[in-house]
Swiss-Prot record:
It is found in: Cell inner membrane. It is a peripheral membrane protein. Keywords: ATP synthesis, Cell inner membrane, Cell membrane, CF(1), Hydrogen ion transport, Ion transport, Membrane, Transport. This is ATP synthase gamma chain.
Amino acid sequence: MAGAKEIRSKIASVQNTQKITKAMEMVAASKMRKSQDRMAASRPYAETIRNVIGHLALGNLEYKHPYLEERDVKRVGYLVVSTDRGLCGGLNINLFKKLLADMKSWSDKGVETDLALIGSKAVSFFGSVGGNIVAQVTGMGDNPSVSELIGPVKVMLQAYDEGRLDKLYIVSNKFINTMSQEPLVVQVLPLPPSDDGELKKKSWDYLYEPDPKSLLDTLLRRYVESQVYQGVVENLASEQAARMVAMKAATDNGGSLIKELQLVYNKARQASITQELTEIVGGASAV
């Protein structure tokens, strides 16, 4: 019965792992709902700032903020949003693959790249594969704040202000639904052109003081910060959804493995009983 005992031990081990993955699945589901609430709460703020900036730019054609103007591209920057923890399927690696493809397309044109990394997985990945890392932040937890993101954002905006960067992108996962998350590389600077016709059709009830220039200087920075924060909360919701799905798959696979081991155990036990009966019958015949 040594073989049967060993199989029983394996079954118990898989059952214990199943309990862990089931608990992690339930925790991820709870955290995902909270992340979705934060994601929904931050979205109107980012969209409103985008509309106000678009209206200001349209209403004051004499002044063009540097963040609104295209220029020759010699170096681009990426604010990369990853997770701090693993066990979330291919969420991070799919994001990194998309980023590397985008970086290669710029590299083929002779354009250099800078990286500002958010999340320990990005820090670990680009620490291994290489890359010009100019800023990083990790350990933000499940309730990130804008203040924690100021460091990397400030570094990239300063580089853009000084002409060391000509484009700035945010790289993160967009939460679509529980089963689907999409890796995105989104340009934030210079501000991508919007549908001017749509903005002109809207009714605006704002009076700006002191002047559009002063407001643009502040609002454009707030806009970039809000887009990075939105990327972080969407990535967090994507992380929890991916982890929930991964842990459910692990739990289900554990159930299938237990059934297979149970079948092997039954066969081993049957073989052992058959052997014992054969020995008993053989002994009786000898007497």
